[in-house]
Amino acid sequence: MARDKFERSKPHVNIGTIGHVDHGKTTLTAAISATLSQYTGKSKKFDEIDSAPEERARGITINTAHVEYETDKWYYAHVDCPGHADYVKNMITGAAQMDGAILVCSAANGPMPQTREHILLAKQVGVPYIVVFLNKADMVDDEELLELVQLEVQELLEKYDFPGSEIPFVAGSALLALEAVANNPTIKRGEDKWVDTIYQLMDKVDEYIPTPERETDKAFLMAVEDVFSITGRGTVATGRIERGKVKVGDTIEIVGLRETRNTTITGLEMFQKSLDEALAGDNVGILVRGIQKTDIERGMVLAAPGSITPHTKFEGEVYVLTKEEGGRHTPFFSGYRPQFYVRTTDVTGTIAQFTSDDGSTAEMVMPGDRIKMTAQLIHPIAIEKGMRFAIREGGRTVGAGVVSKIIE
Protein backbone atom coordinates (compact mmCIF):
# COMPACT_ATOMS: atom_id res chain seq x y z
CA MET A 1 0.00 0.00 0.00
CA ALA A 2 2.49 2.64 -1.07
CA ARG A 3 -0.40 4.80 -2.21
CA ASP A 4 -1.26 6.34 1.17
CA LYS A 5 2.19 7.78 1.50
CA PHE A 6 1.87 9.47 -1.88
CA GLU A 7 -1.30 11.28 -0.80
CA ARG A 8 0.36 12.86 2.19
CA SER A 9 3.25 14.20 0.14
CA LYS A 10 0.98 16.64 -1.68
CA PRO A 11 0.41 20.05 -0.14
CA HIS A 12 -2.98 20.42 1.52
CA VAL A 13 -5.19 23.27 0.39
CA ASN A 14 -8.39 24.39 2.10
CA ILE A 15 -11.04 25.54 -0.30
CA GLY A 16 -14.74 26.30 -0.21
CA THR A 17 -17.66 27.14 -2.47
CA ILE A 18 -19.35 30.52 -2.05
CA GLY A 19 -22.21 32.20 -3.92
CA HIS A 20 -25.94 32.86 -3.98
CA VAL A 21 -28.41 30.27 -2.71
CA ASP A 22 -29.57 27.85 -5.45
CA HIS A 23 -26.85 28.81 -7.90
CA GLY A 24 -25.42 25.31 -7.52
CA LYS A 25 -22.70 25.39 -4.86
CA THR A 26 -23.50 21.96 -3.43
CA THR A 27 -24.10 20.44 -6.88
CA LEU A 28 -20.68 21.73 -7.96
CA THR A 29 -19.06 20.30 -4.82
CA ALA A 30 -20.63 16.91 -5.63
CA ALA A 31 -19.58 17.17 -9.30
CA ILE A 32 -15.94 17.91 -8.41
CA SER A 33 -15.93 15.07 -5.89
CA ALA A 34 -17.41 12.63 -8.44
CA THR A 35 -15.20 13.74 -11.33
CA LEU A 36 -11.97 13.54 -9.33
CA SER A 37 -12.96 10.36 -7.48
CA GLN A 38 -10.81 8.30 -9.85
CA TYR A 39 -7.82 9.63 -7.91
CA THR A 40 -9.15 8.62 -4.50
CA GLY A 41 -11.80 6.08 -5.45
CA LYS A 42 -14.36 7.76 -3.21
CA SER A 43 -16.87 10.50 -3.84
CA LYS A 44 -19.63 12.18 -1.88
CA LYS A 45 -23.16 12.38 -3.24
CA PHE A 46 -25.25 15.53 -3.27
CA ASP A 47 -27.53 14.52 -0.41
CA GLU A 48 -24.56 13.52 1.79
CA ILE A 49 -23.18 17.02 1.34
CA ASP A 50 -26.53 18.77 1.64
CA SER A 51 -27.50 17.19 4.96
CA ALA A 52 -24.32 18.43 6.57
CA PRO A 53 -23.65 17.51 10.19
CA GLU A 54 -23.56 20.19 12.84
CA GLU A 55 -20.24 21.35 14.16
CA ARG A 56 -19.30 23.70 16.93
CA ALA A 57 -16.68 26.37 16.44
CA ARG A 58 -16.09 28.99 19.12
CA GLY A 59 -19.39 28.03 20.73
CA ILE A 60 -21.47 28.44 17.58
CA THR A 61 -23.23 25.59 15.83
CA ILE A 62 -22.48 25.50 12.13
CA ASN A 63 -23.64 23.02 9.52
CA THR A 64 -20.67 22.29 7.27
CA ALA A 65 -19.89 19.41 4.97
CA HIS A 66 -16.26 18.43 4.47
CA VAL A 67 -15.38 16.80 1.19
CA GLU A 68 -11.88 15.70 0.23
CA TYR A 69 -10.52 15.22 -3.27
CA GLU A 70 -7.24 15.57 -5.05
CA THR A 71 -5.73 16.68 -8.34
CA ASP A 72 -2.27 15.80 -9.66
CA LYS A 73 -0.91 18.80 -7.81
CA TRP A 74 -2.80 19.10 -4.53
CA TYR A 75 -4.87 17.42 -1.89
CA TYR A 76 -8.00 19.50 -1.25
CA ALA A 77 -10.16 19.79 1.83
CA HIS A 78 -13.39 21.38 0.61
CA VAL A 79 -16.05 22.99 2.79
CA ASP A 80 -19.63 23.44 1.66
CA CYS A 81 -22.28 24.96 3.91
CA PRO A 82 -25.90 24.30 3.01
CA GLY A 83 -27.47 27.32 4.70
CA HIS A 84 -26.64 30.97 4.11
CA ALA A 85 -26.43 31.70 7.85
CA ASP A 86 -23.97 28.80 8.12
CA TYR A 87 -21.70 30.44 5.56
CA VAL A 88 -21.64 33.69 7.45
CA LYS A 89 -20.89 31.91 10.71
CA ASN A 90 -18.30 29.65 9.13
CA MET A 91 -16.40 32.50 7.54
CA ILE A 92 -16.51 34.77 10.58
CA THR A 93 -15.55 32.14 13.16
CA GLY A 94 -12.88 30.74 10.87
CA ALA A 95 -14.13 27.21 11.46
CA ALA A 96 -12.51 26.57 8.11
CA GLN A 97 -9.83 29.04 7.11
CA MET A 98 -9.88 29.10 3.32
CA ASP A 99 -6.78 29.31 1.14
CA GLY A 100 -9.09 30.09 -1.75
CA ALA A 101 -12.73 29.92 -2.80
CA ILE A 102 -14.75 28.95 -5.84
CA LEU A 103 -17.45 31.55 -6.43
CA VAL A 104 -20.44 29.87 -8.07
CA CYS A 105 -22.69 32.15 -10.09
CA SER A 106 -25.58 31.07 -12.28
CA ALA A 107 -24.95 32.06 -15.89
CA ALA A 108 -28.72 32.16 -16.38
CA ASN A 109 -29.41 34.64 -13.54
CA GLY A 110 -26.19 36.58 -13.12
CA PRO A 111 -24.99 37.99 -9.78
CA MET A 112 -27.59 38.07 -6.99
CA PRO A 113 -27.61 39.66 -3.50
CA GLN A 114 -25.75 36.83 -1.78
CA THR A 115 -23.17 36.78 -4.57
CA ARG A 116 -22.24 40.29 -3.50
CA GLU A 117 -22.51 39.43 0.17
CA HIS A 118 -20.21 36.42 -0.09
CA ILE A 119 -17.62 38.39 -2.09
CA LEU A 120 -17.72 41.11 0.57
CA LEU A 121 -17.40 38.52 3.34
CA ALA A 122 -14.51 36.83 1.55
CA LYS A 123 -12.77 40.20 1.41
CA GLN A 124 -13.43 41.01 5.06
CA VAL A 125 -12.33 37.70 6.49
CA GLY A 126 -9.29 37.51 4.24
CA VAL A 127 -9.98 34.78 1.65
CA PRO A 128 -6.97 35.50 -0.56
CA TYR A 129 -7.97 34.01 -3.94
CA ILE A 130 -11.21 33.46 -5.84
CA VAL A 131 -11.88 31.42 -8.99
CA VAL A 132 -15.29 31.79 -10.66
CA PHE A 133 -17.51 29.01 -12.00
CA LEU A 134 -20.41 30.22 -14.16
CA ASN A 135 -22.86 27.39 -13.57
CA LYS A 136 -25.96 26.39 -15.57
CA ALA A 137 -24.23 27.44 -18.80
CA ASP A 138 -26.36 24.83 -20.60
CA MET A 139 -29.33 27.18 -20.12
CA VAL A 140 -27.61 30.04 -21.97
CA ASP A 141 -27.48 29.66 -25.75
CA ASP A 142 -25.99 33.07 -26.40
CA GLU A 143 -22.22 33.50 -25.97
CA GLU A 144 -22.74 37.24 -25.52
CA LEU A 145 -24.99 36.67 -22.52
CA LEU A 146 -22.27 34.57 -20.89
CA GLU A 147 -19.74 37.33 -21.50
CA LEU A 148 -22.15 39.85 -20.01
CA VAL A 149 -22.55 37.83 -16.81
CA GLN A 150 -18.77 37.42 -16.64
CA LEU A 151 -18.35 41.20 -16.92
CA GLU A 152 -20.91 41.79 -14.18
CA VAL A 153 -19.14 39.37 -11.84
CA GLN A 154 -15.75 40.91 -12.68
CA GLU A 155 -17.06 44.37 -11.81
CA LEU A 156 -18.47 43.07 -8.54
CA LEU A 157 -15.14 41.46 -7.64
CA GLU A 158 -13.24 44.64 -8.47
CA LYS A 159 -15.60 46.66 -6.31
CA TYR A 160 -14.32 44.63 -3.34
CA ASP A 161 -10.65 44.85 -4.38
CA PHE A 162 -10.28 41.44 -5.98
CA PRO A 163 -8.37 41.55 -9.30
CA GLY A 164 -11.45 40.92 -11.48
CA SER A 165 -9.60 40.87 -14.79
CA GLU A 166 -7.00 38.35 -13.56
CA ILE A 167 -9.44 36.00 -11.86
CA PRO A 168 -10.03 32.82 -13.87
CA PHE A 169 -13.57 32.14 -15.13
CA VAL A 170 -14.89 28.75 -16.25
CA ALA A 171 -18.42 28.24 -17.61
CA GLY A 172 -20.08 24.85 -17.30
CA SER A 173 -22.90 22.81 -15.84
CA ALA A 174 -22.36 21.08 -12.51
CA LEU A 175 -25.60 19.13 -12.84
CA LEU A 176 -24.89 17.76 -16.33
CA ALA A 177 -21.33 16.87 -15.31
CA LEU A 178 -22.64 15.06 -12.24
CA GLU A 179 -25.19 13.15 -14.36
CA ALA A 180 -22.54 12.18 -16.92
CA VAL A 181 -20.26 10.76 -14.21
CA ALA A 182 -23.18 8.96 -12.55
CA ASN A 183 -24.09 7.30 -15.87
CA ASN A 184 -20.49 6.37 -16.65
CA PRO A 185 -18.24 6.31 -13.55
CA THR A 186 -15.10 5.55 -15.60
CA ILE A 187 -15.61 8.57 -17.87
CA LYS A 188 -12.30 10.12 -18.95
CA ARG A 189 -11.31 13.65 -19.72
CA GLY A 190 -12.30 14.55 -23.29
CA GLU A 191 -15.36 12.26 -23.39
CA ASP A 192 -17.98 14.73 -22.19
CA LYS A 193 -17.95 18.49 -22.60
CA TRP A 194 -19.58 19.16 -19.23
CA VAL A 195 -17.27 16.86 -17.28
CA ASP A 196 -14.40 18.63 -19.03
CA THR A 197 -15.57 21.97 -17.61
CA ILE A 198 -15.05 20.52 -14.11
CA TYR A 199 -11.50 19.49 -15.07
CA GLN A 200 -10.89 22.96 -16.53
CA LEU A 201 -12.13 24.54 -13.31
CA MET A 202 -9.78 22.44 -11.19
CA ASP A 203 -6.87 23.21 -13.55
CA LYS A 204 -7.54 26.90 -12.94
CA VAL A 205 -7.78 26.38 -9.17
CA ASP A 206 -4.49 24.44 -9.26
CA GLU A 207 -2.78 27.21 -11.21
CA TYR A 208 -4.27 30.28 -9.58
CA ILE A 209 -4.17 29.47 -5.86
CA PRO A 210 -0.53 29.43 -4.72
CA THR A 211 0.79 26.82 -2.30
CA PRO A 212 -0.31 28.03 1.14
CA GLU A 213 2.48 29.27 3.38
CA ARG A 214 3.04 26.69 6.07
CA GLU A 215 2.44 27.90 9.61
CA THR A 216 6.03 27.06 10.53
CA ASP A 217 7.36 29.54 7.95
CA LYS A 218 5.59 32.51 9.55
CA ALA A 219 6.86 34.73 12.38
CA PHE A 220 6.83 33.00 15.78
CA LEU A 221 3.83 33.57 18.05
CA MET A 222 2.56 31.82 21.18
CA ALA A 223 -0.30 32.97 23.38
CA VAL A 224 0.52 32.53 27.06
CA GLU A 225 -1.88 30.16 28.82
CA ASP A 226 -0.11 29.71 32.13
CA VAL A 227 2.99 30.87 34.02
CA PHE A 228 5.14 29.01 36.56
CA SER A 229 8.32 29.80 38.36
CA ILE A 230 10.93 27.09 38.76
CA THR A 231 13.28 27.66 41.67
CA GLY A 232 16.81 28.30 40.50
CA ARG A 233 15.85 28.34 36.82
CA GLY A 234 13.42 31.18 36.38
CA THR A 235 10.00 31.73 34.84
CA VAL A 236 8.23 29.39 32.42
CA ALA A 237 5.35 30.43 30.16
CA THR A 238 3.27 27.63 28.66
CA GLY A 239 0.99 27.56 25.63
CA ARG A 240 0.49 26.24 22.14
CA ILE A 241 2.66 27.74 19.42
CA GLU A 242 0.27 29.32 16.95
CA ARG A 243 2.79 29.83 14.16
CA GLY A 244 6.48 29.87 13.36
CA LYS A 245 9.26 28.14 15.21
CA VAL A 246 11.57 29.04 18.05
CA LYS A 247 14.94 27.88 19.38
CA VAL A 248 16.80 28.11 22.67
CA GLY A 249 18.81 31.36 22.61
CA ASP A 250 16.29 33.26 20.44
CA THR A 251 15.27 36.77 21.47
CA ILE A 252 11.51 37.21 21.72
CA GLU A 253 9.06 39.92 22.78
CA ILE A 254 6.39 39.73 25.45
CA VAL A 255 3.44 41.69 24.03
CA GLY A 256 0.12 42.83 25.46
CA LEU A 257 -1.50 44.12 28.67
CA ARG A 258 1.67 46.05 29.68
CA GLU A 259 4.77 47.57 28.10
CA THR A 260 6.33 45.30 25.49
CA ARG A 261 9.55 43.70 26.81
CA ASN A 262 12.35 41.69 25.25
CA THR A 263 13.74 38.49 26.69
CA THR A 264 15.87 35.53 25.69
CA ILE A 265 14.73 31.92 25.66
CA THR A 266 16.90 29.85 28.00
CA GLY A 267 15.02 26.58 27.68
CA LEU A 268 12.18 24.76 25.90
CA GLU A 269 10.26 21.86 27.37
CA MET A 270 7.61 19.57 26.00
CA PHE A 271 6.14 16.58 27.89
CA GLN A 272 8.77 17.05 30.66
CA LYS A 273 11.59 16.69 28.15
CA SER A 274 13.82 19.51 26.98
CA LEU A 275 14.10 20.32 23.29
CA ASP A 276 16.20 22.63 21.11
CA GLU A 277 13.49 23.82 18.76
CA ALA A 278 9.69 24.00 18.98
CA LEU A 279 7.31 24.33 15.99
CA ALA A 280 3.80 25.57 15.25
CA GLY A 281 1.26 23.26 16.87
CA ASP A 282 3.52 22.21 19.76
CA ASN A 283 2.35 22.66 23.35
CA VAL A 284 5.47 23.88 25.12
CA GLY A 285 6.90 25.50 28.20
CA ILE A 286 9.27 28.37 27.39
CA LEU A 287 11.82 29.35 30.01
CA VAL A 288 12.61 33.08 29.79
CA ARG A 289 15.58 35.00 31.18
CA GLY A 290 15.30 37.88 33.65
CA ILE A 291 11.51 37.85 33.87
CA GLN A 292 9.65 37.51 37.17
CA LYS A 293 6.51 35.40 37.42
CA THR A 294 4.58 38.63 38.12
CA ASP A 295 5.82 40.20 34.84
CA ILE A 296 4.00 37.80 32.58
CA GLU A 297 0.40 36.59 32.60
CA ARG A 298 -2.21 34.72 30.63
CA GLY A 299 -3.37 36.77 27.64
CA MET A 300 0.06 38.10 26.72
CA VAL A 301 1.80 36.64 23.69
CA LEU A 302 5.41 35.68 23.12
CA ALA A 303 6.37 36.66 19.59
CA ALA A 304 9.23 37.24 17.18
CA PRO A 305 10.47 40.83 17.76
CA GLY A 306 8.54 43.41 15.74
CA SER A 307 6.05 40.88 14.36
CA ILE A 308 2.99 41.98 16.35
CA THR A 309 2.02 45.10 18.28
CA PRO A 310 -0.48 45.78 21.08
CA HIS A 311 -3.65 47.74 20.25
CA THR A 312 -6.77 48.92 22.02
CA LYS A 313 -9.06 49.99 19.19
CA PHE A 314 -10.13 48.03 16.15
CA GLU A 315 -12.95 47.43 13.69
CA GLY A 316 -14.46 43.99 13.39
CA GLU A 317 -17.07 41.94 11.58
CA VAL A 318 -19.27 40.24 14.12
CA TYR A 319 -21.99 37.62 14.04
CA VAL A 320 -24.27 37.95 17.08
CA LEU A 321 -25.64 34.64 18.32
CA THR A 322 -29.36 33.97 18.48
CA LYS A 323 -31.12 33.03 21.68
CA GLU A 324 -31.34 29.41 20.43
CA GLU A 325 -27.57 29.34 19.97
CA GLY A 326 -27.06 30.37 23.57
CA GLY A 327 -26.67 34.06 22.85
CA ARG A 328 -28.51 37.07 24.24
CA HIS A 329 -32.29 37.17 24.38
CA THR A 330 -32.46 40.95 24.00
CA PRO A 331 -30.83 43.51 21.72
CA PHE A 332 -27.86 45.67 22.76
CA PHE A 333 -27.09 49.29 22.02
CA SER A 334 -24.08 51.51 21.40
CA GLY A 335 -21.91 51.66 24.54
CA TYR A 336 -22.40 47.95 25.29
CA ARG A 337 -19.46 46.67 27.43
CA PRO A 338 -18.86 42.93 27.02
CA GLN A 339 -15.60 40.97 27.28
CA PHE A 340 -13.61 40.28 24.15
CA TYR A 341 -12.06 36.84 24.28
CA VAL A 342 -8.86 36.96 22.26
CA ARG A 343 -6.63 33.88 22.00
CA THR A 344 -6.38 32.98 25.71
CA THR A 345 -7.98 35.81 27.65
CA ASP A 346 -10.97 38.07 28.20
CA VAL A 347 -10.47 41.84 27.97
CA THR A 348 -13.31 44.23 28.71
CA GLY A 349 -14.14 46.61 25.89
CA THR A 350 -16.83 48.96 24.69
CA ILE A 351 -18.65 48.58 21.39
CA ALA A 352 -18.67 52.23 20.46
CA GLN A 353 -20.57 52.17 17.19
CA PHE A 354 -21.87 49.73 14.65
CA THR A 355 -23.45 49.47 11.23
CA SER A 356 -25.31 46.54 9.75
CA ASP A 357 -23.38 44.51 7.18
CA ASP A 358 -24.79 46.42 4.20
CA GLY A 359 -23.35 49.66 5.60
CA SER A 360 -26.60 51.19 6.87
CA THR A 361 -26.48 52.59 10.39
CA ALA A 362 -28.08 50.44 13.04
CA GLU A 363 -29.62 51.81 16.24
CA MET A 364 -29.49 48.50 18.05
CA VAL A 365 -28.19 45.00 17.47
CA MET A 366 -30.55 42.04 17.59
CA PRO A 367 -29.52 38.44 18.30
CA GLY A 368 -28.78 36.82 14.90
CA ASP A 369 -27.55 40.05 13.29
CA ARG A 370 -24.29 40.48 11.47
CA ILE A 371 -22.62 43.83 12.14
CA LYS A 372 -19.50 45.88 11.58
CA MET A 373 -18.39 47.43 14.84
CA THR A 374 -15.68 49.51 16.44
CA ALA A 375 -14.37 48.23 19.77
CA GLN A 376 -12.31 50.06 22.39
CA LEU A 377 -10.49 47.78 24.85
CA ILE A 378 -9.44 48.84 28.35
CA HIS A 379 -6.00 47.14 28.02
CA PRO A 380 -3.78 46.90 24.95
CA ILE A 381 -3.44 43.35 23.62
CA ALA A 382 -1.68 41.79 20.66
CA ILE A 383 -4.16 41.88 17.80
CA GLU A 384 -3.81 41.81 14.04
CA LYS A 385 -6.02 42.01 11.00
CA GLY A 386 -7.82 38.74 10.24
CA MET A 387 -7.62 37.54 13.84
CA ARG A 388 -10.66 35.83 15.36
CA PHE A 389 -12.25 36.75 18.65
CA ALA A 390 -15.37 35.94 20.66
CA ILE A 391 -17.61 38.39 22.50
CA ARG A 392 -18.63 37.09 25.90
CA GLU A 393 -20.85 38.24 28.69
CA GLY A 394 -20.91 36.56 32.08
CA GLY A 395 -18.98 33.59 30.75
CA ARG A 396 -21.20 32.83 27.77
CA THR A 397 -20.42 33.58 24.15
CA VAL A 398 -22.77 36.14 22.64
CA GLY A 399 -20.94 36.79 19.38
CA ALA A 400 -18.00 35.82 17.20
CA GLY A 401 -15.93 38.13 15.11
CA VAL A 402 -12.89 38.78 13.00
CA VAL A 403 -10.70 41.89 13.12
CA SER A 404 -11.11 43.78 9.84
CA LYS A 405 -9.01 46.87 10.63
CA ILE A 406 -6.67 48.09 13.38
CA ILE A 407 -7.34 51.69 14.42
CA GLU A 408 -4.88 52.34 17.25
Swiss-Prot record:
Residues 80-83 are annotated as: G3. Transmembrane segments: none annotated. InterPro entries: EF-Tu_GTP-bd, EF-Tu_GTPase, EFTu-like_2, EFTU_2, G_TR_CS, P-loop_NTPase, Small_GTP-bd, T_Tr_GTP-bd_dom. The keyword Plastid applies. Its main location: plastid. Residues 173-175 are annotated as: G5. This is Elongation factor Tu, chloroplastic.
